[in-house]
Regions:
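Cell-wall glycan-active module
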Residues: 1-156, 160-176, 211-212, 227-231, ...
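Substrate-binding/active-site groove segments that recognize
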Residues: 48, 184-208
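Extracellular/periplasmic catalytic domains that process cell-envelope and extracellular macromolecules
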Residues: 150-154, 186-189, 262-267, 287-289
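N-terminal cap/lid subdomain of alpha/beta-hydrolase-fold enzymes
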Residues: 176-185
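Short acidic, low-complexity segments enriched in Ser/Thr/Gly/Pro
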Residues: 212-215, 219-222
Length: 325
């Protein structure tokens, strides 16, 4: 009896300077999810196909609560202290002296929980349209070209960090109680595949998208956000005009920010923009997960998970086949 899921189709090609197809991406994400957060779970009759269960078992009230055991490649159900009956046949199974059937388990994993779904979790902010693998692949390919995330190792590190940041590609919005600690407050909490946070980062990305230069007006002190800066200079006659311009644009930025959690284009593009802006391509080239994580997260929060996800993205993308290694 197999206690693992049927293996998904694996890819053997190198992804350097190559677009993902929808099938490529689905296969990679499925493989990663199958290997993520796996724990063995006992199986019960309630989760077994009813038409495969012998009527012998169904005559008992609450028969679905019975755990399933395995003995010599046969699934069996225990009655009393020592009696076991075949799950499929309902006939008694003779257990040899000194032997004991064991619980039948299946691995629960991220794939068991999420399947092939993408960014489907019901959060305060979610994608306005259901996401397909075709669209997700298109957006990733465009971002990879635009921001030079163009080799296997760069893409592996990028996707592994995104996988953690988005809770396994289920949401592009940070549901958290710590939002008050971000500069600018809850309007500027984490959004996107790599969670963009703080008002000054949103302003910088707004400038990048709209080809504006409002961030140059923000001459901050250490630890000071844009909103804090506006408050500080509002009474300064020489900076009053700057304060007014920043105040007006930050209202636009506040409205724009939600695009990063509701529109997959901005969710992907903002992450890739952040990646290149912070020279993460060059860091990823060194294959140093810790260094990448510190740059993304500002510390080592979740480092063991980031290391593990990087490892399994390498396996899923068959990094051993990479032509640029």
């Amino acid at each position: 009896l197999k206690n693992i899921m049927e293996p998904s189709t694996k890819t053997t090609k190198c992804f350097c300077h190559t677009d993902f197809t929808a099938d490529d991406l689905r296969s990679i994400i499925r493989t990663v999810r199958e290997k993520s957060n796996t724990v063995p779970q006992k199986q019960f009759l309630s989760s077994y196909p009813s038409d495969k269960i012998a009527n012998f078992h169904k005559k008992y009230a609450n028969y679905g609560a019975n755990p399933i055991y395995t003995y010599k490649n046969e699934l069996v159900i225990k009655y009393g202290a020592t009696d076991y009956y075949s799950l499929a046949k309902g006939t008694k199974v003779n257990v040899a002296q000194g032997e004991t059937p064991v619980f039948w388990t299946k691995n629960k994993s991220d794939y068991t929980v999420y399947g092939d779904n993408l960014f489907h979790n019901n959060t305060n902010e979610k994608l306005l349209r259901p996401l397909t693998y075709e669209v997700f692949a298109k957006e990733l390919n465009e971002a990879f070209r635009k921001y030079e995330i163009n080799t296997c190792v760069r893409r592996i590190h990028f996707l592994a960090q995104c996988y953690l940041e988005t809770w396994r590609f289920t949401k592009a919005y940070e549901d958290t109680t710590k939002a008050a600690g971000y500069k600018g407050g809850a309007d500027f909490l984490g959004r996107g595949l790599i969670h963009l946070t703080n008002d000054y980062n949103y302003l910088a990305y707004y400038d990048a998208v709209n080809a504006t230069t409002y961030a140059k007006l923000y001459k901050n002190r250490i630890g000071e956000g844009v909103i804090d800066y506006i408050r500080r200079i509002s009474g300064d006659a020489t900076l009053k005009a700057d304060a007014q311009k920043l105040l007006e644009v930050m209202e636009k930025v506040r409205a724009f920010a939600k695009n990063l959690s509701t529109d997959i284009h901005y969710a992907v593009d903002s992450a890739a923009w952040f990646w290149k802006k912070n020279k993460l391509n060059e860091i990823a080239d060194t294959d140093d997960v810790r260094a990448v994580s510190v740059k993304v997260n500002g510390g080592t929060n979740g480092l063991p998970e980031r290391e593990y996800y990087t490892k399994i993205f390498k396996e899923a993308m068959r990094y051993n086949n990479c032509k640029s290694k």
